[in-house]
């Protein structure tokens, strides 16, 4: 039914949690256009050594867009415009984003039958305006900060986001906690569809094989953490937790993959706590190379202060690894049994350390974790999204 249809995706990124489902959904469409918001200010992060610009560096094109193995019928187009993500100034991003998208649609003669906008602002605003102008159905997905933080940042934002929600034909979100917030904002019939993982990229790898491939020591208790080195990820608490664990379990080795504006500060903390042998910063790694790091580890650990529904949690489960983390966003919906991981409140390094120590010495059932994870493969999640698309295009 959809093979003669074109899908327009509006997003703020084109990497894992957007890229993976889009490329599965694309098999059912004639053409998929993905218009990715890009702020040219993000390119200054490596040039101007000021905190504001360094914080924006993670949104530069090289991190924002991943074209690896992109299908031929998916066209990814950066939509560049300047905006300031600061309080009510960020409201101006909506109309600016819309103007740029309209110019791109006209310039490239883009034809579409359905719109799927990811994030309520500013992509959601653009989707709502396009839906009105072209009389096309709009699917809107709320992910994280755009749901639990942005609407409450000011009365103007509350009104703007409520207006966007009113114009969507179908609203999706990634966790039940988000659904409750959206209901309070006036959204009706919100469908919860969690994020997922790519079966092609994340799967069980024998530990010995992974250790050998990565040249990692066999006599260490290796745990993995992946994420931007930013305040919201709570890495200072994880580093302090590793210090506590190392006193009882000197063989612990936490490997961090990623980068961010707090890198220098967090490296200094590791040095100050004298745990350079227990906490290593590996920098960024390609998404398709992460499976071996999961394979080499005992489990995955997160210290996030807030989340929507972290993709890395599903990737961990998809590799047969338990998830040790914090009770934020949709995480407790997924890690709903001690068979799949252990959770604590954020900002509590002592309980996090206790959970890490327990996890090191617990006998985990890898097969049970793998079996549980299958429902969260992007293939399964996308079946539900396709059903929604088909109903809207009838």
What is each PLM-predicted segment?
Residues 337-338, 342-349, 358-363:
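Conserved acidic donor-binding segment of nucleotide-sugar-dependent glycosyltransferases
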Residues 284-285, 292-297:
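Short alpha-helical donor nucleotide-sugar binding micro-motif in glycosyltransferases
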Residues 172, 217-233, 239-242, 255:
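Conserved donor-binding/catalytic core segment of Leloir-type glycosyltransferases
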């Amino acid at each position: 039914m959809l093979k003669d249809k074109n899908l327009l995706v509006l997003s703020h990124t084109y990497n894992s949690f957007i890229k993976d489902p889009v490329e599965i959904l694309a098999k059912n469409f004639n053409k998929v256009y993905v218009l990715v918001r890009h702020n040219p200010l993000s390119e200054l992060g490596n040039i101007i050594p000021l905190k504001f610009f360094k914080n924006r560096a993670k949104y530069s094109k090289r991190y924002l867009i991943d074209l690896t193995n992109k299908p031929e019928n998916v066209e990814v187009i950066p939509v560049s415009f300047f905006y300031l993500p600061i309080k009510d100034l960020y409201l101006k991003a909506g109309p600016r984003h819309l103007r740029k998208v309209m110019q791109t649609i006209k310039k490239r003669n883009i034809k579409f039958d359905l719109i799927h906008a990811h994030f309520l602002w500013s992509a959601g605003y653009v989707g709502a305006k396009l839906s009105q102008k072209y009389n096309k159905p709009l699917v809107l997905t709320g992910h994280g900060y755009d749901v639990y933080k942005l609407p409450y940042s000011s009365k103007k934002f509350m009104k703007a986001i409520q207006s966007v929600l009113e114009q969507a034909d179908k609203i999706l979100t990634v966790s039940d906690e988000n659904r409750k917030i959206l209901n309070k904002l006036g959204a009706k019939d919100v469908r919860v569809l969690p994020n997922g993982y790519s079966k092609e990229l994340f799967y069980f790898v024998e530990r010995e094989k992974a250790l050998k491939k990565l040249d990692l020591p066999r006599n260490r208790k290796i745990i993995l953490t992946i994420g931007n080195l930013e305040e919201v990820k709570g890495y200072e608490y994880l580093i302090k937790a590793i210090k506590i664990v190392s006193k009882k379990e000197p063989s612990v080795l936490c490997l961090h993959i990623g980068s961010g504006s707090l890198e220098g500060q967090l490296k200094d903390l590791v040095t100050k706590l004298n745990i350079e042998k227990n906490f290593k910063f590996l920098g960024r790694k390609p998404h398709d190379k992460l499976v071996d790091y999961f394979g080499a580890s005992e489990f995955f650990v997160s210290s996030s202060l807030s989340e929507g529904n972290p993709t890395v949690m599903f990737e961990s489960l998809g590799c047969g690894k338990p998830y040790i983390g914090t009770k934020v966003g949709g995480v407790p919906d997924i890690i709903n049994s001690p068979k799949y991981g252990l959770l604590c409140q954020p900002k509590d390094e002592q309980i996090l350390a206790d959970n890490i120590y327990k996890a090191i010495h617990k006998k985990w059932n890898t097969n049970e974790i793998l079996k549980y994870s299958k429902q969260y493969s992007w293939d399964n999640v996308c079946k539900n999204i396709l059903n929604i698309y088909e109903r809207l295009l009838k």
